[in-house]
Amino acid sequence: MRQQQMRNIGIMAHVDAGKTTTTERMLFYTGKIHRMGEIDDGATTMDWMVQEQERGITIQSAATTVRWREVDITIIDTPGHVDFTAEVERALRVLDGVVVVLCAVGRVQPQTETVWYQADRYDIPRVCFVNKMDRIGADFFSVLDQVHNKFGIDAVALQIPIGSGTSFEGVIDLITMKEIFWDAASSGEQMEYRPIQSARIAQAREAREKMLDVISIYSDEVTECVLAGEHVPVQLLHAEIRKAVRERRYVPFLCGSSRHNLGVQPLLDAVVEYLPAPQERKAVEGFHVQKKEPVFIAPTAEGPLLALVFKIQYEREAGLLCYVRMYSGKLRTGDSIVNIGKKKRERVYRILRMHSNKSETVECIQAGDIAVIVGLKSAQTGDSVGDGSCPVVLESMHFPEPVISVSLEPMDASSRDKLQETLGILSREDPTFSVREDAETGQLLISGMGELHLDVLTTRMREDFNVQVRVGKPHVTYRESIRKTVERTLRVQRVIGGKEYMAGLTLRVEARKRGAGNEFFCQVKELRGTVCTAHTAPAEIIGAVEHAIRGAWDGGIQSGYPCVDVGVHLLSVEYQELTSSPFIFEAAAVQAFGEACVAAEPYVLEPIMSVELSCAQENVGDVMNVIIQRGGIILGMDSKHGRELVHAQAPMKKMFGFSTDVRSASRGGASFTMRFSHFESCA
């Protein structure tokens, strides 16, 4: 019953669509805060980091819980900037519903598409809120059309705006057929419902008919009412929309202006009415590590304990905070739990509910809850934890590869150890941040999703960890892969410390589909040796080979860049009990892998970026020339409100300093977004 009174939602959008402002209003109207902060003042509740307040953007996802109409709503506010898309990915993995905030002027923007497809991957129901209806050029219906055309799903207006731009003053609710207005003197807390004015009744009836047309496609009861010419009851509409949203038949749309305190309470109503409670979602799929088979876990508090760690955050006093989503069972302070993948047992010191960067200690959480555990020293993002009675590993998360690197060194030698510790914490927090040492120069290299991403991280090193560092110029992070399939058999004999060691194995390396990732397959059918029979090689030997291959992927083939999309099959093993050991098999595996990959025609890949650029019509030729001169390809153009939108792709290695050239070519009148698209063979 408690789960029915819960919602776990995310607020997601393209940068500057008004996502954090919308969340701030939600906190105010639910009574969670008593004064609304503004982004321009660096005073919003969910943007608590100094870097967020200084830059006016969300960098880290932040969680809070509010209460609306007797329902507890856990809200995760996520970044809108492409450099921090990992924060969106891990939030979506554990959410039951999403509010997508769209700008009424900008409409569907690049990061809107990214988060939409991320939500599709996890099959998450959503409602949409068209914000900034007060802006000049706002067009509610164009946003709906663009969503329908881009994503192939019906966009159903549950409201229509009264006016737009500077004349926007309220909405018409098509469910109740009432006009809604907000009192500015009460900061929008007081709402007034009025009959629809005669001048607007025809438009409202037409919009309601369109809404009912879509709803009736998926509801026999609504169809019967419409055909009989009867009034469709409000509660029936709520129930049928809720069912259709849960099944992702269509997406309901609302509108408003969060900055001017218009439209947020109906959005909260929509979250309660239409987005699913935890137990209304499908049973979560996992993999039983003992039975070696997929299993489905029902979201019930009476089941075995099972939770997913979806975020790690360092806190100076508490240490590592592990954000978890509870999928089954109950967890209490002091309980002993098992990290299922790592087979490590640890004790829960404290359980916290977060309100941005503040916390409240609780004694118990259960299925459906999102909370923080303190005390898990070995946990990483994507780990599954349980009580040990049900050893099930849940699906983890997919994170994009870092595409840009900078060299890093401490300002003084005494800070070297502290820098290493800091990098360890940051890389544990952020799965898209990696650290490695250049094999040729010995330089320390850090890699991330973009210049802003790395700038934020190096600023945190200085300000949060008091580590002064010298940062080199950014350069592109390349990858290596192979074109052919090659087998290699290798037998290694070495004498170490007067003792002879032997290892023999056969590997096959193969090129995988772009984006498929690296994968290790153990296909040992025959094990040759003086004591072994088929399938009797010790598990530590197979594990040593896999461990060595995973390390070899990171080390690259010829150029030292990490490997992508390379499959490795272990076909056979020659093992002798007295002369074979894991370390000699690791050496053999690395050598065999390297020789096979060299023969498999290795090549280097570079990151290609998607660019969307907006400029005045008179500047479009000059702006396109800037892209073409940097090796870019123009994919298409659109016109919007007298401005031209240029869609292009370009190699990242040629995009450093792009913003300066674009400003010059457009005389300061252009803006652009750039995000990673894919890796492609270097020309």
UniProtKB/Swiss-Prot annotation:
Occurrences of domain tr-type G (ranges): 4-279
Subcellular location as annotated: Cytoplasm
SMART domains hit by this protein: EFG_C, EFG_IV
InterPro entries the UniProt entry points to: EFG_II, EFG_III, EFG_III/V, EFG_V, EFG_V-like, EFTu-like_2, G_TR_CS, P-loop_NTPase
Pfam families for the chain: EFG_C, EFG_III, EFG_IV, GTP_EFTU, GTP_EFTU_D2
GO BP terms in the entry: ribosome disassembly
GO molecular function: GTP binding; GTPase activity; translation elongation factor activity
GO CC term (a single one): cytoplasm
Keyword vocabulary terms for this entry: Cytoplasm, Elongation factor, GTP-binding, Nucleotide-binding, Protein biosynthesis
Residues that bind GTP: 13-20, 77-81, 131-134
Stored PROSITE patterns: G_TR_1, G_TR_2
Superkingdom assignment: Bacteria
SUPFAM superfamilies: EF-G C-terminal domain-like, P-loop containing nucleoside triphosphate hydrolases, Ribosomal protein S5 domain 2-like, Translation proteins
Family: Belongs to the TRAFAC class translation factor GTPase superfamily. Classic translation factor GTPase family. EF-G/EF-2 subfamily.
Protein's job: Catalyzes the GTP-dependent ribosomal translocation step during translation elongation. During this step, the ribosome changes from the pre-translocational (PRE) to the post-translocational (POST) state as the newly formed A-site-bound peptidyl-tRNA and P-site-bound deacylated tRNA move to the P and E sites, respectively. Catalyzes the coordinated movement of the two tRNA molecules, the mRNA and conformational changes in the ribosome.
Protein name (Swiss-Prot/TrEMBL): Elongation factor G 2
Species: Treponema pallidum (strain Nichols)
Lineage: Bacteria, Pseudomonadati, Spirochaetota, Spirochaetia, Spirochaetales
Gene: fusB
